[in-house]
Amino acid sequence: NSLIVFTKNRDKKITELYLVPKQPGNYNAKKIGALNVESIVTGADYNEKLQLLVLTSTKKFTKYYLTTIKNFSLDIKQDYEMKMYEIPIGKTQVEAVKIIDNKNFWITSEDEKNSKFARLMKFSL
């Protein structure tokens, strides 16, 4: 019944997580924790049934990564097992990720000067 909002912290390379209700209205976001992802988050998806959180991120805007966090719940813990995989996309701006299942994901990127096309890719582990 809530949306998870992820922040970008370019200096500390962490992401903070906040909850807001899905219903229309004025709310204060409730901070539920932070994750040390060692990168700048550009997209995220959470599948409650799979207990899987997936993030797309970059370290220096030249390489992009997919990070999986298994057994994730909204009761933020500090001992999550995070795995980071390089996305073979080159220099472009990865914008979003959608979980298909535990090993397959849709990833989108912006249209950039050097790539000339926006991209939709299926990424498999």
Spans of features found by a protein language model:
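Sequence/structural signature of beta-propeller domains
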Residues: 1-125
